[in-house]
């Protein structure tokens, strides 16, 4: 089912609003059951808007809004995510999503953020300054094909436990700047296609990148492929494996 608008409604005491409560308020209610998203959650229709009623606590948000292709904005300011461990594919393929408020989104226990925002190709900007990523081990495809975002600030990201960064920023074709100066890649085993097709990226600082855990060329394959504006003099790096991959991808 396509979504026009979404927000969270909880009772003041934290309990779920009941079906009877909503019928009394004039909502047309129905239950939408799906094994992977919105499981046993209620969908309400009123004034051409669709409102989702969520449980008070979750531990798995995998694919929750996946392929909600008409969703344009979402406010998750009241969402209790303190127990969540998986946000993979959460907003994947939300092609019309251009605004999202994650300022109160707690990620303290999240271990998997793979493809979380993948193919959100209408998203102009995203504020992740409150994200805590200390336990995250998978960022594969996290921002892949966010083709309208011009800048992402990830300075607060703790990536010391991340093992997979493949396709992380792949096809962010409008991205001109990104701050990765605090990235810790000591445990990363996969960086293939990490920046591939970032065709507007002109400079990048990879001074802190450590590729010791990367064993084969396939694990860095096409890391910078399609970065047509990226010049070697604007790339800071110390790891010889990065230099080798730059030589291959940029045909230096």
Regions found by a protein language model. Give the residues of each.
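N-terminal capping/linker segments that flank leucine-rich repeat
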Residues: 1-82, 206-215, 221, 225-252
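Residues marking helix boundaries in flexible regions
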Residues: 24, 75, 86, 101, ...
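Short, solvent-exposed linear patches
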Residues: 51-63, 78-89, 104-115, 130-141, ...
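Canonical position 11/12 of the leucine-rich repeat
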Residues: 57, 69-72, 83, 95-99, ...
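Periodic small-residue-enriched repeat registers in elongated scaffold domains
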Residues: 64-65, 90-94, 116-120, 142-146, ...
């Amino acid at each position: 089912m396509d979504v026009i608008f979404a927000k969270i409604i909880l009772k003041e005491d934290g309990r779920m609003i009941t079906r009877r409560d909503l019928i009394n308020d004039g909502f047309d209610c129905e239950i939408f059951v799906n094994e992977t998203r919105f499981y046993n959650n209620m969908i309400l229709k009123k004034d051409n808007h669709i409102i989702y009623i969520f449980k008070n606590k979750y531990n798995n948000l995998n694919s929750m809004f996946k392929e909600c292709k008409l969703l344009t904005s979402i406010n998750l300011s009241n969402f209790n995510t303190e127990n969540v461990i998986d946000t993979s594919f959460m907003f994947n393929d939300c092609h019309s999503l251009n605004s999202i408020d994650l300022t109160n989104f707690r990620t303290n226990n999240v271990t998997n953020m793979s493809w979380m925002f993948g193919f959100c190709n209408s998203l102009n900007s995203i504020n992740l300054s409150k994200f805590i990523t200390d336990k995250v081990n998978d960022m594969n495809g996290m921002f892949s094909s966010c083709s309208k975002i011009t800048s992402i600030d990830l300075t607060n990201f703790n990536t010391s436990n991340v093992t997979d960064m493949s396709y992380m920023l792949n096809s962010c074709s409008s991205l001109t700047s990104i701050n990765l100066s605090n990235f810790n890649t000591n445990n990363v085993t996969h960086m293939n296609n990490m920046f591939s097709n970032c065709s507007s990226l002109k400079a990048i600082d990879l001074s802190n990148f450590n590729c010791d855990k990367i064993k084969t060329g396939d694990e860095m394959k096409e890391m910078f492929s399609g970065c047509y504006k990226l010049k070697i003099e604007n790339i800071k790096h110390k790891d010889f494996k990065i230099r080798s991959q730059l030589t291959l991808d940029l045909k230096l």
